[in-house]
């Protein structure tokens, strides 16, 4: 063999995993309650009730905050990620040499990858054994002077000889996780990636992930997220209904795609809001309920009116219907949150939606939902839930309409004899959240290079 060719092959073999040709990786998304110790005894009703309860707790953590930590060397004003208590879907990964296998909650609304580490002085209870960094031969704490450490909003220098990067990662609602920022080998299936930065947490307070999770894997748009560190340009997932015991799918890399010939496919541009730089943020233009256009409150600084001509799969509106497009995208934007089960609409939008649904459905309202939901209708005696009329609702994102049928809007509360809206009310002026109930049995593709999200209403089996 030619000596030059041999040297080239040796050089290519020595390249880190991040420099290798683009590949694809597939992970199973397990429902958090399917992994619970009492999973076998949980009914579909209880599975749904638990997911809704976690969503409400998670909502309480959305907001703006200034990260603060004792002896902080750097503190900047930025958005704080949503508190991790939602954690609806879990993935199995490995870290270190030899690989320590751990389970983590995935989160599209935060960036940091972290797991609890020994010795832990203030950790929440977890089912898996805790990672011991001293056992891993490839573990290395990052120095405080490193560029990676500078990516953290709040960090400080350790007091040991190497002045390791000590972080305080703050979620909204004053939930925090603290520890050492380090690098180690990350294992996804049969593939290993060297030098992946992650948080080795030794203290967590506030909203903790469920005990089935040893930490969190952030899939957000920031530099410390899994997709950013692996240079993944696209990823896709498909989620089963929240009360289902069937796992979902997550595909990272070039194979992540949505059916190109599907008639019920829409591609929506992702926007960047300076308040939420790590979130997958969509510009919410308006809503349609059946054939009726919903007028957004005239409380923004600028508005523009556009004819509501909706491509498939949106409901066909009246030719004269109009949807109000909001110029102030910061107020009426929506973030995609895989870890929240129900969708939350900004207060004024939610109130309008409720009023219009009451007019359309024409059933008596019920109270005291055992699921903990706000808007419920009493089902007529002898009439099955699947036979009750519910108008389709469409969300407008930059003029592209995402249709939500009854299965993605309402859930049956069998214990109360009602059907209840799987949409909640967020605070006035807050950002809206697109939850996973509205994304069920739908392929969701994130194309980070082109800056768009594609929704395809297709069974999860079609995502290979």
Swiss-Prot record:
Residues 299-311 have a biased composition (Low complexity). Residues 299-319 are annotated as: Disordered. GO terms for molecular function: aspartic-type endopeptidase activity. This is Aspartyl protease 37. Its EC number is 3.4.23.-. Anther-specific aspartic protease involved in tapetal programmed cell death (PCD). Directly regulated by the transcription factor EAT1/DTD in anthers during tapetum PCD and degeneration. InterPro entries: Pepsin-like_plant, PEPTIDASE_A1, Peptidase_aspartic_dom_sf, Plant_Aspart_Prot_A1, TAXi_C, TAXi_N. One of its GO terms (biological process) is regulation of programmed cell death. Residues 1-19 form the signal peptide. The lineage of its organism: Eukaryota, Viridiplantae, Streptophyta, Embryophyta, Tracheophyta. Residues 89-456 form the Peptidase A1 domain. It comes from Oryza sativa subsp. japonica (Rice). The active site is at residues 107, 337. Disulfide bonds join 117-123, 376-420. Belongs to the peptidase A1 family. One of its GO terms (cellular component) is extracellular region. The keyword Disulfide bond applies. It is an enzyme of class 3 (hydrolase). Keywords: Aspartyl protease, Disulfide bond, Glycoprotein, Hydrolase, Protease, Signal.
């Amino acid at each position: 063999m030619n000596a030059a060719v041999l040297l080239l092959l040796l050089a290519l073999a020595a390249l880190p995993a991040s420099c290798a040709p683009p590949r694809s990786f597939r992970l199973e998304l397990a429902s958090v309650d399917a992994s619970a110790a009492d999973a076998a005894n949980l009914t579909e009703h209880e599975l749904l009730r638990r997911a809704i309860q976690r969503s409400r707790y998670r909502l309480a953590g959305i907001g703006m905050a200034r990260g603060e930590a004792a002896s902080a060397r750097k503190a900047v004003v930025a958005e704080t990620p949503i508190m991790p208590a939602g954690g609806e879907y879990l993935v199995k990964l490995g870290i270190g040499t030899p690989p320590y296998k751990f389970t983590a909650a995935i989160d599209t609304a935060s960036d940091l990858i972290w797991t609890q580490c020994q010795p832990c002085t203030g950790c929440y209870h977890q089912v898996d054994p805790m990672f011991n960094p001293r056992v891993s031969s490839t573990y290395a704490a990052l120095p405080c002077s490193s560029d990676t450490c500078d990516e953290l909003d709040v960090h400080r220098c350790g007091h040991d000889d190497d002045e390791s990067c000590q972080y305080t990662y703050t979620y909204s609602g004053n939930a925090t996780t603290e520890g050492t920022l380090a690098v180690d080998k990350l294992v996804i299936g049969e593939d290993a990636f060297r030098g992946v930065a992650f948080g080795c947490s030794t203290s967590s307070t506030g909203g903790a992930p469920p005990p089935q999770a040893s930490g969190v894997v952030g899939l957000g748009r920031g530099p410390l997220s899994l997709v950013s560190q692996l240079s993944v340009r696209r990823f896709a997932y498909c989620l089963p209904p929240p009360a289902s015991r069937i796992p979902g799918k997550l595909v990272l890399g070039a194979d992540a795609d949505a059916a190109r010939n599907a008639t019920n496919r829409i591609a929506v541009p992702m926007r960047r809001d300076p308040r939420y730089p790590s979130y997958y943020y969509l510009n919410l233009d308006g809503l349609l309920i059946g054939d009726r256009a919903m007028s957004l409150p005239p409380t923004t600084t600028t508005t523009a009116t556009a004819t509501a001509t909706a491509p498939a799969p949106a409901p066909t509106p009246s030719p004269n219907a109009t949807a109000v497009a909001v110029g102030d995208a910061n107020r009426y934007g929506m973030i995609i949150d895989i870890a929240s089960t129900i969708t939350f609409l900004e207060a004024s939008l939610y109130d309008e939606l409720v009023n219009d649904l009451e007019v359309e459905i024409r059933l008596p309202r019920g109270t005291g939902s055992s699921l903990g939901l706000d808007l419920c209708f009493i089902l007529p005696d002898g009439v099955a839930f699947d036979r009750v009329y519910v108008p389709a609702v469409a969300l407008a994102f930059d003029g592209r309409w995402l249709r939500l049928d009854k299965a993605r809007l309402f859930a049956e509360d069998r214990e109360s004899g009602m059907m209840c809206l799987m949409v909640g009310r967020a605070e006035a002026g807050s950002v809206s959240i697109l939850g996973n109930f509205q994304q069920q049995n739908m392929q969701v593709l994130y194309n980070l290079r082109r800056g768009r999200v594609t929704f395809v209403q297709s069974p999860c089996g079609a995502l290979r």
